[in-house]
Every structure is written in C-alpha cells, then in structure tokens.
Amino acid sequence: MVSSPDYNPNILNRSEFDIPLAESSLDEAPFFNRAISGSYPPASTIKPFIGLLGLEEKIIDASTIIEDVGFFQLKEDGRRYRGWKEDGHGKVNLEKAIVESSDVFFYELSSKLTIDRISSFLAKFGFGETTGIELLTETESILPTRNWKLGNIGETWFVGDTINIGIGQGYITSTPLQLAVSLSAIANRGIIYKPTLVTQDYGQESNQKTFASVKIKNQSHWEVIEKSMISVINSWNGTAHNLYKEGGTVIA
C-alpha cells in the first residue's frame, strides 16, 4: 500500500519534531495517506463493473455492437457527451470498449441501466463504504443515488448524471484501496477479501477474512470481463499496453 509523495521516516525520530506543523509547511502533504484517505473519481476503472452489470441485466451480451462516432447524444435534450477519442472507436463490442476505453459505449450502456441499478450493483462490491482495514484515517467514498443528490446537492437526478457515473466521473468517488479491493472481486469470482495489516507472512496458514461475496446470475460473465481487463495490457490496442512485458506476469 503506497502513498505518494513520500517522506523521510527518520525525521520522526527527532523528539522535537512537530507533525502538525510539518504537515502544514510541506508541499503536497506527504503525511496524507492517499491510499486510504484520498477520495477520487474512479474514472475508467469503473467500466468493467458497468459492463458486468450490462451483461447481467441482459442489456448487452458479449457480441453487442455499438457505433462509437466520438460522442453520445441524449434523445431527451439532444446534448452530446464526447468521448476521449475525438473521432471515436468505430464499431465496438464490450471487450473492445474495455480494451480501448470507449466512453461512448459506456455512455449508452449506463443510460439504459439507470442510476438505481448501477448504485445497487456497485454497493455489492464495496463502493460507498470503507474496507475496514485497521487504520484510523480511512475515508468513506461516495456512491451517489437519487436521494444522495437530493440531500447533498439539493437537485433531482438527471440522465446526464448517470452517463457521467458510467465512465467513473461525476459524483462518484473511491479511495485507491477500496477500488483495488473491489476490482479484486472480479478475479476472485465475487469474493471480496477484507484487507488487513500483517507483521509477517503466514503462508498457507493465513486465515484471511472475506468482506462480502457478490453473486451473479451467469458465472461465465466473470470470464468475459476478466479477459477484457487482461487485454487492456496484453493487446496492442490496449490503453495500458505500455505495461506489457513479453513472458511476464499477466495482470489486469
């Protein structure tokens, strides 16, 4: 668990060291543990969850094609939501949408899913909650709902809000640790392990506690999403292909 920027731990050994004073005087707040206290938009890392929900709700299947022309236009008001790639990604199925991070694919999908289903599904993976790690400064992230927006912003929910959530922007936030724990559930086929601090490696004797277990209707959907995530690195057109190493460990 890493937080950057770091600091020299030796300065904490000095009896006269004043941590609050140092925090206020040092640039970029190195004593702020971003891994558990920083709350940020999850951005495109939310897309595998939205894709999985789309499969589960039968809004799409693995072969569904959406034409990504660089923007998605709302029928209600004609407003255009642009993707990061100006000229679009062309014909896109779910795997390509995750591999190339097509915003337009997930704009359209999330608009059909609605915020109610999205929020309920993400909550199962721990979004909007702390992980329960044994550290006092862990921040609870935001999983917005219609009632959350009405109570905190004083406005009703709009379809445009849902579209933003579909690409991990807007009101939704997560801590780096919470996001890592949630994403690990895809590799673990729905099992979410509670992160914990350890003093040594207990090997096979370790009795790691589960935080929750996400049940889905079709188990093959785990493989569809995991394969797409792996291809983000292993495929030449993946947005993280620069991390690929020949013969190295496959990661997603």
Model-derived segments and spans:
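Beta-lactam-recognizing serine transpeptidase/beta-lactamase-like catalytic domain environment
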Residues: 1-44, 49-252
